[in-house]
């Protein structure tokens, strides 16, 4: 086992680590510690309003904006979930993640979906992620060719005040939620990014 001297070394390292973490919290740079207390009222209302309406959900994002969601889907959805019909899925949509600019992947996703029966959620913390913008551009054009009112089929999760996606969101009138600016990508799954999906 470990003797007291060895434990003292680790205790000191733990104290130093905790001290650094508390300093980040005091400087409002570690927003992830506040995520359990976030207000989810608007998100829950939105999710309830959309429930049962769409056969497909396309999540557009990369890195921290998609990896947590993919992990949740793999952990919580049964194997072969997307192959099941709407009733077998409990009136929940199939989940597709557009997380890179591979044209074959985007094409395959869109070939599986119908524009009027698909909801799109675009996620980028900065609002200016190039891969996300490229994918959303393709998906937006696909929606625009298939339906009259695209804004009813798109929501965004992005920076509250800056970035290209924020400007587009405000101009087009998309439903929008804010990524907490002080929450890093690796923790975003615990924020609106993961909870809404």
Locations of regions flagged by a protein language model:
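Extended, charge-enriched "interface" segments that sit outside catalytic cores
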Residues: 1-51
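Glycine-rich phosphate-binding loops that contact phosphosugars or nucleotide phosphates
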Residues: 48-197
